[in-house]
Amino acid sequence: MEINSFSFVLEPSYKKDGSLHSWEILTKNIFKKNANDYQANEMPFSFDALNEKEIIDAFNKQLLTIEKLEGFHLKFPLLSLNVDSLISDYILTDKYVSEHIKRKNNIALEINENFHEFKSLNCMSDLKKLSRLGPLWLDDFGGGLTSLKVIELFKFECVK
């Protein structure tokens, strides 16, 4: 089913001193076209309900939302985008998207706790490539595949 619109929110993250550290852009709702059943548009949103194309579409809409926010000339600190293995592959294989992110100085990529490279802990080549585009943060440390070994092997700029 085709997606009609998205609803995003900005969730603040604060430093120890109480000052604003960053904003995380989160997808709160997705409204599908021609959906007339309760589950399609009225249930609480979950990325698990989306297929790969829809997940990539949501990510692209997040990038466009950041562009719109920049048009208001607000003084935003970093804005973080959640990145799982699918989105990582998309970023690294789409030259336009990777260059777009690299040109921005206000986007951090927040790596999902179940990221595929955390399984083997070898060379972490995808993380190295992503780090050339901007700051990398580790999301939900302690959950999923994250461990002390992960943060020993790769220097994240922020661990949440």
Feature-to-residue mapping (PLM):
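Bacterial c-di-GMP phosphodiesterase EAL domain
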Residues: M1-K102
